[in-house]
Design a protein with these regions (language model features):
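N-terminal nucleic-acid-engaging modules of covalent nucleotidyltransferase systems
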Residues: 2-211
Length: 211
């Protein structure tokens, strides 16, 4: 086959084009935080889950899902200005034993140290077997009235403080941290939760006039 001059010109000047395959568009799917917790969760687990929610509506949803009286008790203690703690503010003095060594200092500092250790180790195991807690806020909340004004004013202050320390020592460190925070109305410094959120989640709570 003889190619003409025109054919040759076309062949030498026409650029070969290739079609590149289109890459499929990628979509980022936001991973939603599960609202499911173990049966009878510790209250620090509930409050931690509340903190992880980015919207007010989701925080309220978590509070409604895990609604129970002990949770309301600590939230009222913390957020109701008419609830006045009659325990000394700030650090809680403590003297105890660790193996054969005597430990002297403050309960708050001791618990904070344990909490930091748990975070650094990534170990939040629970239960009596691991020494992280022998009781819960759920069980002990019935005694909290003794620590507020008008609850049990006839109780000797030394006895009251001793009871408070005993409860703290029996709790999981993260639950003890909650109780100490509520005593001084500082729960909001640990967990992202406000009185407004609590009030919307639990409209049955009557605020004020409790002392």
């Amino acid at each position: 086959m003889i190619l003409s001059h025109l054919d040759l010109k076309i062949m030498t000047t026409t650029k070969k084009t290739t079609t590149k395959p289109r890459k499929p568009k990628s979509f980022t799917v936001k991973k939603q935080v599960s609202l499911d917790l173990p049966r009878n969760p510790f209250l620090f687990e509930v409050l931690d889950l509340v903190s992880k929610q980015r919207t007010k509506a989701k925080k309220i949803e978590v509070l409604k899902k895990y609604e129970e009286l002990p949770l309301k008790v600590i939230l009222i203690w913390n957020f109701d200005e008419s609830v006045v703690s009659i325990l000394p503010p700030g650090e809680v003095p403590y003297t105890g034993y660790n193996d054969q060594n005597v430990y002297k200092g403050g309960v708050s500092a001791k618990i904070s140290e344990e909490v930091r250790s748990m975070h650094s180790q990534g170990n939040f195991s629970l239960g009596v077997s691991d020494g992280q807690g022998h009781t819960t806020i759920r069980r002990e909340s019935k005694h909290f009235y003794r620590f507020i004004k008008g609850g049990d004013d006839g109780l000797n202050n030394l006895r009251r403080e001793s009871m408070f320390i005993n409860i703290l020592e029996g709790l999981h460190p993260l639950e003890a941290e909650i109780v100490i925070a509520c005593k001084d109305k500082k729960l909001g410094e640990i967990y992202k939760i406000t009185k407004e959120i609590v009030a919307e989640a639990y409209p049955d709570i009557q605020w004020g006039d409790r002392s």
